From Swiss-Prot:
Part of a stress-induced multi-chaperone system, it is involved in the recovery of the cell from heat-induced damage, in cooperation with DnaK, DnaJ and GrpE. Acts before DnaK, in the processing of protein aggregates. Protein binding stimulates the ATPase activity; ATP hydrolysis unfolds the denatured protein aggregates, which probably helps expose new hydrophobic binding sites on the surface of ClpB-bound aggregates, contributing to the solubilization and refolding of denatured protein aggregates by DnaK. The lineage of its organism: Bacteria, Pseudomonadati, Pseudomonadota, Alphaproteobacteria, Rickettsiales. This is Chaperone protein ClpB. Residues 765-858 are annotated as: C-terminal. Residues 160-341 are annotated as: NBD1.
Amino acid sequence: MNIDKFTAHAKSAITNCQHIAAKNDHQQILPLHLLASLFNEDTGIIRTLINNSGGNLNILADQVQVELNKIPKVQVDGGGTIYSSAELLKVLQRADDLAKNNGDSFVTIERILEALSFDNTIAGKILTNNGISSKKLAASILQLRKGKKADTESAENSYDALKKYGRDVTELAESGKLDPIIGRDEEIRRTVQVLSRRMKNNPVLIGEPGVGKTAIIEGLAQRIFSKDVPETLINCRIIELDMGALIAGAKYRGEFEERLKAVLGEIKESSGEIILFIDELHLLVGTGKTDGAMDASNLLKPMLARGELHCIGATTLDEYRKYIEKDAAFARRFQPVYVSEPTVEDTISILRGIKEKYELHHAVRISDSAIVAAATLSNRYITDRFLPDKAIDLIDEACSRMKIELSSKPEELDELDRRIIQIKIELAALKKESDEHSKKKIEHLTAELEKLESNSYDMSSKWQAEKSKIQGQQKLKEELDRARIDLERAERDANLAKASELKYGIIPEIMKKIQETENADSKGLLKEIVSESDIASIISRITGIPIDTMLSSERERLLVMEQKLRESVIGQDEAIKSVSDAVRRSRAGIQDINRPLGSFLFLGPTGVGKTELTKALAGFLFDDRNAILRIDMSEYMEKHAISRLIGAPPGYVGYDQGGVLTEAVRRRPYQVILFDEVEKAHPDIFNIMLQILDEGRLTDSQGITVDFKNTIIVLTSNLGAEILVNQKEGEDTYKVKDQVMEYVKMVFKPEFLNRLDEIILFHRLNQSNIHDIVKIQLEGLKKILSAQNIILEFDEPALNYLAEKGYDPSFGARPLKRLIQREIQNNLAKMILAGEVSSGKIVKITAKKEELKIQIID
């Protein structure tokens, strides 16, 4: 007997039996220890053999443990030597003889089990007493191996390789576990056509992620099950190869190749009845490749070329080009079947087809408007993924959200129960008091508590009844699903009596019951129908784009948007109106979907409110004045700096980091983008903007298309400022627009200007405007001081003084800020530090005799 002729699993079993003996303080290793070790092996081979021979592994393992406990324990200080018994050596020798007699080069674990069944020791008796004879084991081994010989050290890995490393898709179709496949007839027909060829009958499905490549295979499996395929494929089974299971645990060199060869061998023996499906086909290229070893694709090539292997691959366009096309010999053995993204109409049909499966899983109902919304809204707003996958995800998440809400207590009932708890706590505290007021309060609260508890009981009963109704509906739908699967099976097996009973008796009866429960009073506490607004709400959460149904308060807010913006931007009514109209168009849903929500060029002198209006707009839309993407164009004066916006080109530092502009918009597609001081940038930068303004998209350095259709783009410039500054007070800006545009046309190309929604001129601020701005600035200071509990007051003379002294037509409102810092904030800072102004005091600002006075009132 040569121990080197035992397989790795057999050696492991022998080693483990030594550990079992040591653990139990036994001095000898007996066949019983070896049997216990075999029962612990993890390949599942022993369990299969025991089951096929009419035994039960769990019962046998318990009996072995009982016998192990009967063996006397010998405890030796410092540990003693454990000897192999003569019986054990006889069993191993018999296993070696059995292997040789059956033409095996290596002794496997099943031969050791067979050798134990011949044994007259306790181990052998346990097997025979449970009806597991050597003859039965020999027959089970033959059935398991299917005539294969053990000629490698890891021979056990090749048994039932397809079952171990594959998933039977046709079996899933038979048991009704696959979703129905709608459409894709052309792709399935082309796949069947390639599979029916004599040579190179291997289609590869190529398409973007999420377009339904795997679904086509499931559709083909369903057609094979229903015999809706040519005769050549009627008896075929589709087995999906599990690459993870194939690679996992392949420790030794050549073990992976051995497993793959075992899979291919079983497919070859099936005489064309097994079609191998390899999802993510590109993983085969290079898998298992080590020094001197072949990768998986090279093992497949001979069988693929000869037509001995029916194989369907699936991969994406990028990975097909990157991995498979580079290996021309591998690529030519496959016939590409291109799977395009379905249209919105096709997606709606697909969603209608799988609707029942999702309703059954989540125990909710899906309205048709939700299906249409999922297809149309996902196509419009989720641009970095593909239909139908992104639409199915929306439906799934909306159903999941509703299911969670259904299982939770309704908000109305929850508030009621919380109020009851609050009153009970209040009553417990009041009962300790004895005064008259407390007694009256107790009476009042007791009456309120009785009323609330009665309402809570009624509402809880109603809620429980509604939950029971929904659970009843769910059970009926599950029954209907099972009945339909049984009907398909009965029709396939030509069991006409059962088919007619199901078709004309059981199924109509269940459908009638479902209809009755659905038609019952639906105005309850629980909402169980997924609607269009639920889908819109999910998209809003994913993208940040507010497309869910507007509340009446938001509608009113949008109608008075100009007033809100005028609170912080003074004297620029024309600009405010243009921006407000753009926002209202987008929220009303009548905006051109292929362009940004609005694109504006703000022209005017410094300090008149160009940047301030952009901040006010961000504050209105997002409740955060800083929620804008501000790009200072003075940083892009050199030509090479332009690439920072879309990312560095390949080969340059920072290529993998993405662009400043594109990455920010990808992460937050709904925002205000401000290109400040745009005339200072290099002229070539406007070539990038042409695509954004016209098509609402831009491709970054890595080839990813970024969607700008939900952004508001604002460009500010000081071009023509001297004309606007010298304009007469109160004169309409349109009178000088032509003069300003001459300056603008000298800097910007006509194709750029033509793509802007509006070019807005900001006129210079007058004395009245400055007065209003002073008030806003002092209100801001008042808010800052209130945080320190200091009250700031100011009168009209102070406002007039600051407005008059801070007014400069050439510089707008900016000198005003410096004046307030100099005249008020500097003096206040000194007073606070000196302790003159402290918490609770009032600071009053007034003006007397052309001088600003700061008074402190206790």
